[in-house]
Design a protein with these regions (language model features):
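His/Met- and acidic-residue-enriched segments that coordinate or traffic transition-metal cofactors
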Residues: 1-74
Length: 74
């Protein structure tokens, strides 16, 4: 967790908001990639559901954060 937080340390206001959005998009992209890899190999219904739920939710959140970034910082 410390590595993810380093990009936020010492920041406030717009700098914090921008760093948070950028880091969270990277974090969510990683989660989506992991879930996609899981779905290629697991046969467990619980993990299939979890993987699909992660892909759906975090893909939507990635788009939301990218839209906010564009609206607020471009």
């Amino acid at each position: 967790m410390g590595g993810m937080m380093m990009g936020l340390e010492g920041k406030t206001g717009d700098a914090l908001d921008l760093a948070f959005l950028d880091e969270m998009v990277i974090h969510h992209d990683g989660a989506v990639e992991m879930a996609q890899a899981l779905l290629k190999g697991t046969k467990r219904p619980e993990l299939i559901k979890l993987g699909n739920d992660i892909i759906t939710a975090q893909t939507q959140e990635i788009q939301m954060m990218r839209n906010w970034r564009k609206a607020w910082f471009n």
